[in-house]
Amino acid sequence: MLRNTVKRLMTYTFKPSKQTSSFGPSVWLEFSPLAIKYNAVNLGQGFPNFEPPKFVKDAMIKTIEVGGFNQYTRSPGHIRLVKALSSVYSPYFGRELNAMTEIMVGVGASESLFAAISSIVNEGDEVILIEPFFDIYIGPILMAGGIPKFVTLKEEESSQAGSSDKKRSSKHWKINKEELAAAFTDKTKLIILNNPHNPVGKVYSKEELQEIADVVAKHGPNTTVISDEVYEWMTFDGEEHHRFATLPGMWERTITIGSAGKTFSITGWKVGWCIGPSNIIGAIANTHQYVPFSVPTPTQEAVAIALEQPNIKDYFKELATMYQNKRDTLLNSLTQAGLDPVIPQGTYFIMGDTSSIHLQGDQGKDTSITGMGLHLRDWNIARYLTTEYGVTTIPPSAFYCDDHQKIPENFVRFTFCKDDLTLQKAHDNLLKLKK
């Protein structure tokens, strides 16, 4: 009998859930380790490598020194933080936000998105994604049994490499509203927008957003909108960020996602939030309580103190100015290196055109990390830039569905949320492409 028991134990086989069985290593598990292996300048993953502002660090120091913030706080959000968020955001939404019912704080924008998607999508529901899309969107959709549908943001031909227009801009990347309308069916439960857009850097005009809103109103009577606006304070050259929820008839169906990590250069603090009507936020909060229950109290208290600064709007402007300067620095480097850049209107990413690079043989096919994407040009180019030129980037095909991964094959994504020394090192390495 004992022998039979041992035999049964030895034959145990683990099988992942059907909801997660299709998941494999992500693009981040390839290129961050590759950057470390080759001691490359990491312009791939979008995290700042500089310190947050002093007033933000002081807020955390004060929180720890005062004490009393070491236990669980209110599940949907620390009271001081949701009140601070209401105070900051109410003018931008053109309405008085109820701190207790219309705002929920999550473990970063990522968990906020997870809780929101999980609260909306049922098995068989369809979710429209605008390609390229941040890869984190797809996981919770599939875990909920949802079916992603894809509409592609396309660069106008007049703006592409080799055209007479010398300045390529993210504003020339457009959604075809007929294609968007055709993606809607009676099963469409959700559409996810990203504005400003990662990785293209597009900032949608109010007219473009209104076109999307019109399509949603006409073809998606029961469709909810998630508007991921974590780069809201990073717009350049006078571009204005318009919130989708402020368009006529859209507040009632829109969840707006924000991020302290992006706003204050504190991605490791993992504080994000959802803003929306109380019936939707209530459902998201119910989901949230069964995942992390609450966000760490000290980080919420510190973010609240930071948002309460009387000159916080000036800080938002300074943030945009800082990133515009860093953008211009990297644009200059890419242009000199022959990597025709798409000038971003916002975010801290730039798409660089690598058509001038011609791989030979097995160049770029380093298999020492995961060996993923060997059949895709942008993956091999990104590996080649890391291994041969010491600059790590991200292949944007990771932000497209399987059927569309050839679309961005001539691009790689660079980030400029790095200190000046890092950008200078990247500049020096990239210029070796011209030798």
Swiss-Prot record:
Organism for this UniProt entry: Dictyostelium discoideum
Keyword set includes DNA damage: no
Modified residues (N6-(pyridoxal phosphate)lysine): K262
Quaternary structure annotation from Swiss-Prot or TrEMBL: Homodimer.
InterPro entries: Aminotransferase_I/II_large, Kynurenine-oxoglutarate_AT, PyrdxlP-dep_Trfase, PyrdxlP-dep_Trfase_major, PyrdxlP-dep_Trfase_small
Superkingdom of origin: Eukaryota
Pathway noted in the entry: Amino-acid degradation; L-kynurenine degradation; kynurenate from L-kynurenine: step 1/2
Keywords carried by this UniProt record: Aminotransferase, Cytoplasm, Lyase, Pyridoxal phosphate, Transferase
Cofactor or coenzyme needed: pyridoxal 5'-phosphate
Family of the protein in this entry: Belongs to the class-I pyridoxal-phosphate-dependent aminotransferase family.
One protein family per Pfam: Aminotran_1_2
BP terms from Gene Ontology: biosynthetic process; L-kynurenine catabolic process
Residue ranges of the TM segments: none
Alphabetized Gene3D superfamilies for the sequence: Aspartate Aminotransferase, domain 1, Type I PLP-dependent aspartate aminotransferase-like (Major domain)
Catalytic activity: L-kynurenine + 2-oxoglutarate = kynurenate + L-glutamate + H2O; 3-phenylpyruvate + L-glutamine = 2-oxoglutaramate + L-phenylalanine; an S-substituted L-cysteine + H2O = a thiol + pyruvate + NH4(+)
Binding site residues for substrate: G46, N198, R413
Encoding gene, per UniProt annotation: ccbl
GO annotations of cellular component type: cytoplasm; mitochondrion
Entry annotated with the keyword Hydrolase: no
Location in the cell: Cytoplasm
Molecular-function GO term, any one: cysteine-S-conjugate beta-lyase activity
Function comment: Catalyzes the irreversible transamination of the L-tryptophan metabolite L-kynurenine to form kynurenic acid (KA). Metabolizes the cysteine conjugates of certain halogenated alkenes and alkanes to form reactive metabolites. Catalyzes the beta-elimination of S-conjugates and Se-conjugates of L-(seleno)cysteine, resulting in the cleavage of the C-S or C-Se bond.
Protein name: Kynurenine--oxoglutarate transaminase
EC numbers: 2.6.1.7, 4.4.1.13, 2.6.1.64
